[in-house]
């Protein structure tokens, strides 16, 4: 048996002592930069290519089946998930899904700025938090009207000098001015009798893609709004004050810019289709309530959607066509059903964004 011997320092065998670390070096290890893609990136690219390589007719049939089986939320988030697969799937989903004007459904974030349904009003409700001066708009899916309903928009009220301002956002966690999820605002005058609705993300040609840092997708936890491309006035709300009837119902008038949209749903990343729509100005006036002698109060027919008498309850009507009943011209109604819960029903030509902004102007004390 050969005895073990200590190797000399001049031996070619490696020493058992660890090599001394060079002085003043960075201990962090950097990956070797290579011109070739990593295997993981290659697999992701190949997977996306396989999804986009489906036959367009077959893909359209698949999305039609998914859309037909997802009539209401939350199952309708499957349609949004399909549109998020790749560009090809998004284009087909936009062609398959009808806008709220035709389908009566809200699917994509762009639906919030499209005209409401033509046949029946879109039933929503607003929850108010007096402590934080915040307001949340939900799509009414059940009669309970809880926070589990489909979230649409949120707003926060703050005072800037002598004016009050509401920041409207599509992210319930981004309720502050300057947030990337803000889509517009509502600003009042000193007396609170005149409000201006501004759209920070007007849908016109040149609107860019979503920002990945801007909140949540519509229907799950990955919603991203359009990149802000401007500041456009899209409406104005005025409250009239009468010296002869200081304790009468509020009288309000609203002038809004209503885009005329036809066809399929608008791709949130494509502003060209919205650029073809021609905005038209429309003046809406509050419906005059009737005096009820037995109840000794002013009354309006809300068709069971309002439960509590309040000075905030109102109905906005469009100009009446010859021979058309006045009940069919109500395009927006707002009413109180609890201390901090209000219903909001809107229809064509208003969008959810415009209707929400008009209802926000009704909160607070004003000389009207």
From Swiss-Prot:
It comes from the Eukaryota. Residues 49-104 form the F-box domain. Residues 1-44 are annotated as: Disordered. Gene3D superfamilies: 1.20.1280.50, Tubby Protein, Chain A. Expressed in stems, leaves, flowers and seeds. Residues 1-17 have a biased composition (Low complexity). InterPro entries: F-box-like_dom_sf, Tubby-like_C, Tubby_C. Belongs to the TUB family. PANTHER family: TUBBY-LIKE F-BOX PROTEIN 2, TUBBY-RELATED. This is Tubby-like F-box protein 2. It comes from Oryza sativa subsp. japonica (Rice). The gene is TULP2.
